[in-house]
Amino acid sequence: MAHYMSMSDSQNRRMPDFREARCPSRVYEGSRDDGGCVVTVFDSALPQSDSNPRALSVAASQSIKDCCARFDWGRGDAGALQLAIALLHDVSGDADTALRWYEHFAKTYVRQLPATWAVPELDIALWLYCFQNARPGA
């Protein structure tokens, strides 16, 4: 028995369908340096410039929900929650989606990231699609 319903059956039509990711050429990269944790976004469909790659903004994610003044991953702290909000919002373009899923995304995805990582936007969009479309109790 399938645990997912089609996107057309979903009540929340603002939810991104991973097959129609907003920027499938985007890759998020995280690394640690002396200044803390840095997350950048590179879009291979755009020319490399001062704005590509760009830093993922902690401040922008704090305007949605302020959990922490920094990003972090690999553990279940407030920095991981802030990164979860930032990634979900950047991928979905929707603050409500980020707020609905950030705690679960931090627990199941961000917490598992290694010290240095690269994640295509499509992976995050697929995570959203699967959790948004899972049947209750499945």
Language-model region placement:
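Short intrinsically disordered terminal tails
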Residues: 1-2, 133-138
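Short, charged/polar N-terminal "headpieces" of proteins
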Residues: 1-47
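Generic hydrophobic, helix-prone segments enriched in Leu/Val/Ile
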Residues: 18, 28, 84, 101-107
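Short, compact, well-ordered microdomains
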Residues: 91-133
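Short linear sequence elements within intrinsically disordered, low-complexity coil regions
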Residues: 9, 33, 76, 107-110, ...
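Amphipathic alpha-helical packing elements
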Residues: 11-12, 36-101
